[in-house]
C-alpha cells in the first residue's frame, strides 16, 4: 500500500466486532521474522549499533512470509486484534479515540506477538535445538507469550522475573508448564534481566536467551503485524499513535511502519517514573536501556504517575466497560491528555492486556 494513496481515498471504515479479528482484505498476523532478516542471539545493551544496522537493512514492505504464523492451531489466533472506540471518556468530540485491544490474543496480551516472533526467528536461524531451554527475563506477559508458544512447539522454558509480579501471572505460567526464578522485588525488571544474563553466560549450550530488549524480532512483530493492522482498520486515517514503553518493541515497530505509510503520523511514547509500580513498563532511566530503542522514532515522550495509570484503569472499566491492566491505564491517561490538546485527529492507543491478571494487586481496590 502506498504512502499517500490510501489516505487520499479512504473513508471511515467499518471496524471489527470485538475480538472477531475481521480486517477486510488485510490478513496480517503476529509477524514472524525470517532468519535472513536479522541475525541475533544473546544480545546485550552494548549491541545497540549492531541491532540498528539490522533494522536499517530491513525491506520496508509487507512480506508474504509474514502473512500468517506457520505453525497452525492456536498460534493462528495471534494478531488481528480489534479496535475499540473510546466514547464516554473522550474529552474532545473533534478527535476520534480508538484502542487496540491486545488482550484478545490467545495468551491474553500483546506479548503473544513477540513470543511467536522471537521463537520462530530462532528456529529459522538454526539457534534453537530441541534439547535447549528457552530463557528470558520478563515482567510476566512476555513470559506467558513464550510459554504459550513453547507449549505448542514442545520447548522447555525458564523465566526470570521480579517477585513483585502478580500472583495471577505466576499461576498462568505454571499452568503452561513454564519454570521461573524470582528475583528480589526491589531490583525491579533490571534484577530479572541480570539473572537471565548470568544463567546464559554460565551455560550457553543449555540456554537460548531470547533477550526481548535487544532482539530485532521483537519490533519486527509489530512492524509486520500490529502497525499494518492499525493502518487498515483506520482506513489510513490514523494521525497519532500512543504506546507505553516496556521493552519498547511495540512503539519502535509500529512507529517505523506507520511513519513509512505516512510520515506525518505522530508517535507518543508513555514512560513511567523511576521506582514505579506499573507492571510491564520500564523507565528508560533504569540501568538497562533496551538496545532496540531508537529515540528518533518517538515524537513525544509522556511520563505517567502510578496513581494516574491505576485510577484511569479503574475509570475505564466503569465508563467503557472493559477491565484493563496497569500499562493500559497509563496509555489511556496519556491518550486522553493528548486528545484534549488536539484540534482534530484520529488517535490509536495500545491496550496491552486485560485486568484479570491484576486482581491480586491494589489496581482495583482503591
Regions of interest found by a model, annotated:
Residues 1-48:
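Compositionally biased, low-complexity flexible segments
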Residues 19, 42-44, 48-366:
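PLP-dependent amino-acid enzyme catalytic core
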Amino acid at each position: 500500500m502506498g504512502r499517500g494513496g490510501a489516505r487520499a481515498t479512504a473513508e471511515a471504515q467499518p471496524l471489527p466486532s470485538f475480538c472477531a479479528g475481521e480486517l477486510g482484505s488485510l490478513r496480517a498476523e503476529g509477524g514472524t521474522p525470517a532468519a535472513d532478516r536479522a541475525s541475533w542471539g544473546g544480545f546485550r545493551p552494548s549491541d545497540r549499533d549492531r541491532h540498528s544496522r539490522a533494522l536499517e537493512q530491513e525491506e520496508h514492505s509487507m512480506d508474504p512470509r509474514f502473512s500468517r504464523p506457520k505453525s497452525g492451531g492456536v498460534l493462528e489466533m495471534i494478531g488481528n486484534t480489534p479496535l475499540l472506540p473510546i466514547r464516554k471518556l473522550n474529552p474532545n468530540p473533534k478527535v476520534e479515540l480508538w484502542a487496540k485491544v491486545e488482550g484478545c490474543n490467545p495468551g491474553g496480551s500483546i506479548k503473544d506477538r513477540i513470543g511467536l516472533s522471537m521463537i520462530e526467528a530462532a528456529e529459522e536461524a538454526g539457534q534453537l535445538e530441541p534439547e535447549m531451554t528457552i530463557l528470558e527475563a520478563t515482567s510476566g506477559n512476555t513470559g506467558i507469550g513464550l510459554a504459550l508458544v513453547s507449549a505448542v512447539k514442545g520447548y522447555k522454558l525458564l523465566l526470570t522475573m521480579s517477585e513483585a509480579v502478580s500472583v495471577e501471572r505466576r499461576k498462568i505460567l505454571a499452568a503452561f508448564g513454564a519454570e521461573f526464578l524470582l528475583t528480589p522485588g526491589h531490583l525491579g525488571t533490571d534484577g530479572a534481566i541480570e539473572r537471565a544474563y548470568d544463567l546464559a553466560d554460565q551455560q550457553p549450550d543449555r540456554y537460548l536467551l531470547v533477550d526481548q530488549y535487544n532482539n530485532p524480532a521483537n519490533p519486527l512483530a509489530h512492524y509486520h503485524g500490529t502497525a499494518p493492522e492499525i493502518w487498515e482498520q483506520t482506513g489510513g486515517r490514523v494521525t497519532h499513535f500512543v504506546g507505553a514503553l516496556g521493552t519498547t518493541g511495540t512503539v519502535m515497530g509500529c512507529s517505523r511502519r506507520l511513519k513509512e505509510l505516512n510520515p506525518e503520523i505522530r508517535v507518543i511514547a508513555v514512560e513511567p517514573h523511576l521506582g514505579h509500580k506499573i507492571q510491564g513498563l520500564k523507565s528508560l532511566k533504569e540501568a538497562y536501556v533496551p538496545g532496540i530503542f531508537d529515540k528518533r522514532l518517538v515524537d513525544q515522550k509522556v511520563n505517567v504517575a502510578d496513581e494516574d495509570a491505576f485510577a484511569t484503569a479503574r475509570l475505564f472499566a466503569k465508563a467503557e466497560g472493559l477491565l484493563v491492566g496497569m500499562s493500559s491505564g497509563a496509555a489511556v491517561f496519556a491518550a486522553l491528555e493528548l486528545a484534549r490538546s488536539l484540534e482534530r485527529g484520529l488517535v490509536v492507543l495500545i491496550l496491552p492486556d486485560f485486568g484479570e491478571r491484576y486482581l491480586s494487586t491494589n489496581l482495583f481496590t482503591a
